[in-house]
């Protein structure tokens, strides 16, 4: 992904074709392909479109909804609340994704509240680059910081994106779990 973002398209093409072949090999073997990070997983659907890749890499919630009947049901009366801050790429490129998380957490007896936040400001490598750091911090302060600092915030807060979790840890010293960590 970084090769593509930074314009190294020739190198990206080589890596993408090699990776696509490996993914297709796993898919042909019948292995469910699940990517943890939404940004990278969705790269296989967009930036890899020219590779001829046949295998489909699912977001965790897409796969979990296929086995929803095998998940344990939550205990009535013990319902708790968890907040989700979704990766901006996930919200825009896989709009059903957030609803799928809600379905999964509901099945587990957990009320999922999706916080209405924009980009955390990290945007992959963007926020790590010195020249972009001030803008990255400004973007974070626009929605993520206030959402995390809400005075009534007592619930667990999760974030789907690795870059988002990294940004929160960098800016506020808080380690947010991925939704899979909250489920386990």
Task: Say what each PLM segment does.
Residues 1-184:
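Iron-sulfur cluster-binding electron-transfer modules in prokaryotic oxidoreductases
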């Amino acid at each position: 992904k970084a090769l593509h973002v930074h314009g190294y398209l020739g190198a990206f093409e080589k890596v993408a074709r090699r990776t696509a072949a490996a993914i297709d090999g796993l898919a042909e073997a019948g292995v469910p392909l699940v990517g943890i990070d939404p940004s990278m997983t969705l790269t296989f659907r967009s930036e890899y479109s020219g590779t001829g890749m046949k295998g489909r890499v699912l977001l965790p919630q897409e796969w979990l909804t296929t086995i929803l009947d095998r998940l344990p049901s939550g205990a009535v009366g013990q319902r708790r609340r968890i907040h989700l801050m979704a990766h901006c790429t996930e919200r825009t490129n896989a709009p059903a994704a957030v609803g799928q998380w809600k379905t999964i957490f509901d099945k587990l007896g957990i009320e999922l509240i999706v916080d209405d936040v924009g980009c955390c400001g990290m945007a992959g490598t963007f926020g790590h680059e010195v020249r972009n750091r001030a803008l990255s911090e400004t973007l974070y302060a626009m929605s993520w910081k206030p959402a995390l600092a809400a005075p009534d915030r007592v619930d667990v807060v999760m974030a789907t994106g690795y870059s988002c979790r990294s940004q929160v840890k960098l800016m506020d010293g808080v380690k947010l779990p991925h939704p899979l960590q909250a489920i386990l």
